[in-house]
Amino acid sequence: MTVLKMTDLDLKGKRVLIREDLNVPVKDGQVQSDARIKAALPTLKLALEKGAAVMVCSHLGRPTEGEFSAENSLKPVAEYLSKALGREVPLLADYLDGVEVKAGDLVLFENVRFNKGEKKNADELAQKYAALCDVFVMDAFGTAHRAEGSTHGVARFAKVAAAGPLLAAELDALGKALGNPARPMAAIVAGSKVSTKLDVLNSLAGICDQLIVGGGIANTFLAAAGHKVGKSLYEADLVETAKAIAAKVKVPLPVDVVVAKEFAESAVATVKAIAEVADDDMILDIGPQTAAQFAELLKTSKTILWNGPVGVFEFDQFGEGTRTLANAIADSAAFSIAGGGDTLAAIDKYGIAERISYISTGGGAFLEFVEGKVLPAVEILEQRAKG
């Protein structure tokens, strides 16, 4: 994968437009979770150090396109950036017809989704973005799977289009895990439904040596192996699909599980052997014996890809399985990559962020890359690099 990289470019005195993913939760005008902004800061600082006139753009939320809405304004993000960078970061609402930014200064453009044609990737809007800059930098992996004006269109028309450090690191890490992984490779794919992760499961079945499944997905695989799953969430119509996947790759199944009679924070957790699951039981986590077996498997792996907690870890009594596996991944010498919103929440909860080799910031983009799909915003950077 060959793309121009921002780190290799001379940006002194250049007008540089950087697309970041600053789509953060905001409540009462305050940023609630700053992970995405923190991830973007090194790129912004580097562009300033290189002497560029820096313009930053992003979307936030899902406003009606073409209309301003205060709740989706990037104002709280501009205020956060001002504090984080120790300088005033002006928020510019009217920028499409040109702005004055001096070298060494940084401005934030208002939500790109307030512009008509952003989501449709309209040429006219993309050309306006491109006219603002000498260099366009795509640094928002989380939106790379969408062909929109500020992620794809602008890269078609800009004089120079490059990948930012965050995007480049993400592509390198995913390429390392999926392109030519050190073996043995284990993947953990968990979630409520096989149907939503079907392409991921099929893709990984052709790459990894062990495919650990969790959550509702595991229940469908258990049913496919002839086990009773009680009133647990599973997909009867995908039992044959689960069998086909299990025929292609080793899918170790739980030998014991944690069950409850109801899905609630107050539910009483009971550990049972898989053969003892009753008709009115709901499987909400893997059992301790299974967790220990899976942990051993992870410790001997050389590459680990993790997407999804294996139990309802939000309730502590159903979180032991996820905690055990999270710690096993953290303790492993393997190259480990983790992605997906729930996975990141589990990493936070168990305090292991520093011990995972790479944490992906992109939810949908991460999954689409794992599925082997082309990410439009990356594809256009590759095309531009070829000239």
From Swiss-Prot:
Pfam families: PGK. ATP binds at residues 197, 314, 340-343. Pathway: Carbohydrate degradation; glycolysis; pyruvate from D-glyceraldehyde 3-phosphate: step 2/5. It is an enzyme of class 2 (transferase). GO terms for cellular component: cytosol. GO terms for biological process: gluconeogenesis; glycolytic process. Its main location: cytoplasm. Keywords: ATP-binding, Cytoplasm, Glycolysis, Kinase, Nucleotide-binding, Transferase. One of its GO terms (molecular function) is ADP binding. It comes from the Bacteria. Its EC number is 2.7.2.3. InterPro entries: Phosphoglycerate_kinase, Phosphoglycerate_kinase_CS, Phosphoglycerate_kinase_N, Phosphoglycerate_kinase_sf. It is found in: Cytoplasm. Substrate binds at residues 21-23, 36, 59-62, 113, 146. It catalyses: (2R)-3-phosphoglycerate + ATP = (2R)-3-phospho-glyceroyl phosphate + ADP. Monomer. PANTHER family: PHOSPHOGLYCERATE KINASE (PTHR11406), PHOSPHOGLYCERATE KINASE 1, CHLOROPLASTIC-RELATED (PTHR11406:SF23). Belongs to the phosphoglycerate kinase family. This is Phosphoglycerate kinase. The gene is pgk.
